[in-house]
């Protein structure tokens, strides 16, 4: 019971931040269809679940990473618009927690870390609300930079191993700058 109390007393801002980030992205994803919205990942993920594969069975204009990730999420939660938006919302929430953790590791007070990470979550994925190649590639690159910074501070060998893997995933999200 004491450990649970310590967890919630120290991490309540992180929990609030995660749910806020997921909510704001989910809200903006449901406002309607806009020119920035892309349905290609929806269709490609559906085709992957049907047994087709990018470049082998059909042509894609972006990297296959988002399509395979989205097909995994469709497999778990079902194929519908809310699940499609959930993919972007979860990435927004996870990235906001990473930014929050980075600011805390730099010694910034947790309230300021929360504020800056919340501002980041408002600007990050809600601009499109749906999975988008530029966002995934940028966020995976930001995650790579954060792991690089943490690796320099903590000197953990497994973190150095994650850097090239995340860079490959970022490349497979969007190959062209």
Briefly describe each language-model feature range.
Residues 15-16, 68, 86, 114-118, ...:
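Hydrophobic alpha-helical transmembrane segments
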Residues 62, 66, 70-74, 78, ...:
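Transmembrane alpha-helices of multi-pass, membrane-embedded glycan-processing enzymes
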Residues 94, 99-122, 155-159:
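Transmembrane-helix signature of polytopic, membrane-embedded enzymes
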Residues 105-107, 144-161, 170:
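Membrane-interface transmembrane helices that cradle and orient dolichyl/undecaprenyl
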